[in-house]
C-alpha cells in the first residue's frame, strides 16, 4: 500500500467513541458540561490565588500553574470533539492534528512535572518546616515552573517533528476522540521504530524522574508523619498533602495504563475510556479536590464571594 507524506494529506478522521456520528450525540451535553465546569473551576482557583495575598506562597504558586495547565489541557481536546459532534463531522486537518498532538503532549507531561514539583514542596513543608522559606525561595519556585514549561515544550516538539516525518497509508481513521501519539503511529506505513524508541526513552526517563520524585517525597513525608506523637498533629500534617496525593493517584493511575504500553497491545476502546479519565475527568475534579479539602482555599473563596456581594449593586 502506497504511503503518502503527512504534509501531502489534507485531513484525517477522528472516530471518537463510535464510528456512527448519531451514537455520539448524547455525549455532547455531558462533555460540554464537564468542559465548562473544568475551565470555570480551574480559572476560579487561579483567581482566588491571585487576589488573596495570603495564598502567595510556593504551594499555591504551583497550584495556580497546575490549574492553568488543567484548563489548557482540557481545551486541547474537548472543544474539537464537541465541534465535530455538533456539525456531524469527524474530520480534522493534518496540521490541526499535529497541533493538537503537540499541545496534548505538552500539557500532559507538564501536569506530571508539576505534580512531582508539588510533591517535593510537600516534602519540604512536612520534613523541613523550619527551613521551608529558605529552601522554597521565589527563585527556586520560578526556576522549577519555568524549567517544566520549557523542557516539556521541547519534548513535545521533538515528538511532533518525528510524527511529521512519517508516511501514512490510505486509512486516515483515528480510533480516538483526539490526535494521540499511539493511534497515529498505528496508521503509519513506514516503520515507526525511531518514534517508538524516542517514546520509550524520553517517556520512560521523564516518567521515571516524576515517579521517583513522588515516591521519595512521600516516603519521607509518611515517615515523618508517623513520628509525630499526637493524633491531631498527624491529621494536620497529612491534610497538607492528602489533596495532592488524591490527584496524583487519579492522574498517574490512568495515564500510565495508556502512554506506557506497547502500541501493538492497545485496545482502541479501552484507550479512549482511559483517556477520558485523565484528559477530562481528572482536570475537572482537581479544583474540587483542592478546594473541598483545603481550608485556606475555602476561606479565600468565601471572602471573594463576600466581597463581590458587598460591591454588587
From Swiss-Prot:
Pfam family, one: 7tm_4
Protein's GO biological process: adenylate cyclase-activating G protein-coupled receptor signaling pathway; signal transduction
Keyword Thylakoid (UniProt): no
Main location, first listed in the record: membrane
Extracellular compartment residues: 1-25, 80-100, 159-196, 260-272
Glycan-modified residues: 5
Membrane topology designation: Multi-pass membrane protein
InterPro entries named among the record's database cross-references: GPCR_Rhodpsn (IPR000276), GPCR_Rhodpsn_7TM (IPR017452), Olfact_rcpt (IPR000725)
GO terms of molecular function: G protein-coupled olfactory receptor activity; olfactory receptor activity
Cysteines engaged in disulfide bonds, as pairs: 97-189
Cytoplasmic-facing ranges: 50-57, 121-140, 220-236, 293-313
Transmembrane segments: 26-49, 58-79, 101-120, 141-158, 197-219, 237-259, 273-292
Keywords: Cell membrane, Disulfide bond, G-protein coupled receptor, Glycoprotein, Membrane, Olfaction, Receptor, Sensory transduction, Transducer, Transmembrane, Transmembrane helix
Superkingdom of the organism of origin: Eukaryota
GO cellular component: plasma membrane
Compartments, record wording: Cell membrane
Keyword field contains Disulfide bond: yes
Family in the record: Belongs to the G-protein coupled receptor 1 family.
PANTHER family cross-referenced by the UniProt entry: OLFACTORY RECEPTOR
Function: Odorant receptor.
Record-given protein name: Olfactory receptor 1G1
Amino acid at each position: 500500500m502506497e504511503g503518502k507524506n503527512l504534509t501531502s494529506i489534507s485531513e484525517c478522521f477522528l472516530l471518537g467513541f463510535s464510528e456512527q456520528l448519531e451514537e455520539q450525540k448524547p455525549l455532547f451535553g455531558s462533555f460540554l458540561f464537564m468542559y465548562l465546569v473544568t475551565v470555570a473551576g480551574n480559572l476560579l482557583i487561579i483567581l482566588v490565588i491571585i487576589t488573596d495575598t495570603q495564598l502567595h506562597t510556593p504551594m499555591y504558586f504551583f497550584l495556580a500553574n497546575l490549574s492553568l495547565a488543567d484548563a489548557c489541557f482540557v481545551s486541547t481536546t474537548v472543544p474539537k470533539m464537541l465541534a465535530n459532534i455538533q456539525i456531524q463531522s469527524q474530520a480534522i486537518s493534518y496540521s490541526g492534528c499535529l497541533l493538537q498532538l503537540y499541545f496534548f503532549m505538552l500539557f500532559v507531561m507538564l501536569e506530571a512535572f508539576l505534580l512531582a514539583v508539588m510533591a517535593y514542596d510537600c516534602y519540604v513543608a512536612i520534613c523541613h518546616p523550619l527551613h521551608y522559606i529558605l529552601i522554597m525561595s521565589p527563585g527556586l519556585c520560578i526556576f522549577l515552573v519555568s524549567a517544566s514549561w520549557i523542557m516539556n515544550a521541547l519534548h513535545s516538539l521533538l515528538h511532533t517533528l518525528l510524527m511529521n516525518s512519517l508516511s501514512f497509508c490510505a486509512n486516515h481513521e483515528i480510533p480516538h476522540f483526539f490526535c494521540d501519539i499511539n493511534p497515529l503511529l498505528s496508521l503509519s506505513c513506514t516503520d515507526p521504530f525511531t518514534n517508538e524508541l524516542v517514546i520509550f526513552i524520553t517517556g520512560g526517563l521523564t516518567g521515571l524522574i516524576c515517579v521517583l520524585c513522588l515516591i521519595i517525597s512521600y516516603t519521607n513525608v509518611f515517615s515523618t508523619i508517623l513520628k509525630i506523637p499526637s493524633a491531631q498533629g498527624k491529621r494536620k500534617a497529612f491534610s497538607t498533602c492528602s489533596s495532592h496525593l488524591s490527584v496524583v493517584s487519579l492522574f498517574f493511575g490512568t495515564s500510565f495504563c495508556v502512554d506506557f504500553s506497547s502500541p501493538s497491545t492497545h485496545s482502541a476502546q479501552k484507550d479512549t475510556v482511559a483517556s477520558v479519565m485523565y484528559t477530562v475527568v481528572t482536570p475537572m475534579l482537581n479544583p474540587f479536590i483542592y478546594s473541598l479539602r483545603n481550608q485556606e482555599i475555602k476561606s479565600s473563596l468565601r471572602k471573594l464571594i463576600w466581597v463581590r456581594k458587598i460591591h454588587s449593586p
